[in-house]
Design a protein with these regions (language model features):
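Alpha-helical transmembrane segments of multipass membrane proteins
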Residues: 14-23, 70, 74, 99, ...
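Internal alpha-helical transmembrane segments of multi-pass membrane proteins
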Residues: 84-105
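Terminal transmembrane helical module of multi-pass membrane proteins
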Residues: 126-155
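Membrane-interface helix-boundary motifs at transmembrane edges
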Residues: 2-3, 83-90, 153-155
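N-terminal signal-anchor transmembrane alpha helix
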Residues: 2-31
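Membrane-interface interhelical connector segments
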Residues: 30-56
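Hydrophobic alpha-helical transmembrane segments
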Residues: 61-79
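Interfacial helix-loop-helix junctions of multi-pass membrane proteins
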Residues: 53, 109-130
Length: 155
């Protein structure tokens, strides 16, 4: 029998690992747009600003920590709202897709503009669709499936 904490931790870990792995593979390895280190430093720069890029390897690990903190927060939130959203109990894949899109909206239209007041304008292009797809597939869907497994014993 799974516990609430194990469910939230496992869904947060799965989402965090899948998301950062996809980001590094796609943006650093395949597209050569950046490096794994810069991806993680950019996460840390939300708090440490420009110092995140010059403070060395420790900022890479701090960025990774922030990344997982965010993943755990979204995993916890889905776990808490699951019993109150009837749709989540009906179709796990569509629930994950909708929650992944919700996460993308929260991060890109609320959190990032607050943390980084000057961001490039968003255009409906391949990069935008790719970023949405990564969050849906690597964060929303895994959180939905892991959380659903916990609640399956009640619904």
């Amino acid at each position: 029998m799974r516990s609430k904490v194990k469910t939230i931790v496992s869904s947060g870990l799965a989402a965090g690992i899948l998301d950062i792995t996809a980001a590094i593979l796609i943006y650093a390895v395949i597209l050569h747009k950046t490096t794994a280190e810069k991806i993680l430093q950019s996460i840390a720069s939300g708090v440490f600003k420009k110092d995140a890029y010059t403070a060395g390897a420790e900022m890479t690990f701090i960025g990774l920590g922030f990344h997982f903190l965010i993943a755990f927060i979204f995993a916890w939130f889905y776990f808490k709202i699951f019993p109150y959203i009837p749709f989540f109990k009906i179709n796990t894949v569509l629930s994950g897709v909708s929650y992944g899109f919700f996460i993308w909206v929260v991060m890109n239209l609320i959190v990032l503009p607050i943390v980084f007041p000057v961001l490039p304008e968003k255009k409906l292009d391949f990069a935008l669709l790719l970023s949405i797809l990564i969050v849906i597939c690597c964060v929303g869907i895994p959180i939905a499936f892991i959380t659903r497994k916990y609640y399956a014993k009640w619904y």
